[in-house]
């Protein structure tokens, strides 16, 4: 893994490196089960993350990692190098603030990470992304996060059309800049005109309505 990290580091000028370390559903199973039985899954996780973060710091990088696992035991953040940034993510329209709160209370440096709602969808969940991004940016301000990282994923072969993520990307810029912004419909009209060249100002509202018509998503079609 460290050799792979060094190969990747050589390709980018940034001083940041995201080791990911999220959704570790299989940790403590298979070959790692005896060690997990001895140490516990959370200890197994944090020891490995710590080793990679310390390696990155020694290489002059600022480590980042996704926070979905550590939020179950947020006090473990104190064991990581002080340069480490926790990427606290959540993509629901009514995303709860628990994860952002507990990581802030534990003293973590964190970015709040909403999403544009395109992955596994025929059409981006436009209204969902508007609500999610507004909420997560609000949590970022409330808990003094160091930044916002707006995400766009491409699960299961990236069926989602990249151009349809533009509204969510613009919502991220708008809400991370400040709390006072236009309502959903008004902002969508501006995005339609400026990002898509639609003089009627209705294109993004049509996108939002199209998303509401979906009977099943790409995950259901592809996996289930």
Predicted regions span which residues?
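Substrate-binding groove of N-acetylhexosamine-processing glycoside hydrolases
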Residues: 2-10, 14-16, 23, 35-224
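Short acidic/His/Gly/Ser-rich catalytic and metal-binding motifs that mark active-site loops
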Residues: 26-31
């Amino acid at each position: 893994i460290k050799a792979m990290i060094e190969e990747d580091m050589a390709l980018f000028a940034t001083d940041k490196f995201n080791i990911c370390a999220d959704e570790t559903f299989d940790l403590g199973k298979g070959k790692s089960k005896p060690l997990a039985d001895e140490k516990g899954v959370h200890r197994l996780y944090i020891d490995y993350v710590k080793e990679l973060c310390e390696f990155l710091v020694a290489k002059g990088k600022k480590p980042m990692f996704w926070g979905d696992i550590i939020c179950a035991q947020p006090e473990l953040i104190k064991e990581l190098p002080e340069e480490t940034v926790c990427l606290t993510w959540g993509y629901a329209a009514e995303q709860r603030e628990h994860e952002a709160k507990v990581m802030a209370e534990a003293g973590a440096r964190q970015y709040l990470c909403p999403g544009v709602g395109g992955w596994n969808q025929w059409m981006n969940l436009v209204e969902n992304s508007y609500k999610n991004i507004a909420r997560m940016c609000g949590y970022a301000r409330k808990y003094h996060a160091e930044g916002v990282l707006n995400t766009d994923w491409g699960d299961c072969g990236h069926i989602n059309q990249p151009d349809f993520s533009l509204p969510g990307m613009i919502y991220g810029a708008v809400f991370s800049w400040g709390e006072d912004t236009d309502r959903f419909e008004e902002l969508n009209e501006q995005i339609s005109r400026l990002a898509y060249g639609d003089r009627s100002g209705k294109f993004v509202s049509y996108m939002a309505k199209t998303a509401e018509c979906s009977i099943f998503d790409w995950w259901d079609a592809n996996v289930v």
